[in-house]
Regions:
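Acidic, Ser/Thr- and proline-rich intrinsically disordered linker/docking segments
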Residues: 57-158
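Phosphoinositide-dependent membrane-docking surfaces
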Residues: 30, 46-65
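Short amphipathic beta-strand/extended segments with alternating polar/hydrophobic composition
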Residues: 40-52, 118-127
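Anionic N-terminal interaction surfaces
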Residues: 1-47
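Generic detector of solvent-exposed, compositionally biased contiguous segments
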Residues: 1-7, 12, 51, 78-86, ...
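Acidic-enriched, low-complexity/disordered segments with a strong bias for Aspartate over Glutamate
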Residues: 2, 17, 22, 27, ...
Length: 158
């Protein structure tokens, strides 16, 4: 899977709600194109992110944030530093004290080093195509050698 079309949530200088972006993996960069139109897509703005600046790509939700907070490595990853505003989006779901069924909100997060090496994130709504997003993440990890082995203690094996 080398191309996705997802709704932008936060992280790019895009105005408006419900704006879709095409995300394309190229040889050395990730190309994100803001689009307009439904049947006849029109490119508006294009953003390029070097693959070597990407820290991680992940789908987060309330459950896997809690799992990551239990591990040594995950405490740092699950924080707002890495996930930025997406942590607040998903964290809000866990703030209810009532025992009611809550629809899980998934967020596709691309964390990367910006200018001056500050950690930033771009967040998208994977919607109903979550399986395609998972495949896109696997392809990125295979391409960039980012498959990390984590042992039973939550430590990354080097």
């Amino acid at each position: 899977m080398d191309k996705l079309s997802l709704m932008h949530l936060e992280g790019l200088p895009i105005k408006g709600d419900s704006v879709f972006c095409d995300i394309t993996m190229q040889d050395e960069s990730l190309k994100i194109t803001e689009t307009s139109g439904i049947f006849k897509k029109k490119a508006k703005n294009t953003f390029s992110l070097d693959l070597n600046k990407i820290i991680s790509m992940d789908i987060i939700n309330e459950k896997n944030i809690q799992e990551k907070q239990k591990s040594i490595v995950g405490r740092g990853i699950a924080g707002a530093v890495l996930f930025g505003p997406a942590g607040a989006i998903v964290g809000g779901l866990s703030g209810t004290g009532k025992k009611q069924k809550i629809k899980t909100k998934n967020v596709f997060v691309i964390s990367y080093y910006g200018k001056d090496n500050e950690v930033k994130s771009i967040n998208f709504d994977p919607g109903l195509v979550i399986a395609f997003v998972e495949e896109f993440i696997r392809d990125y990890e295979d391409k960039c050698g980012k498959n990390q082995q984590v042992n039973e203690h939550g430590e990354i094996e080097l």
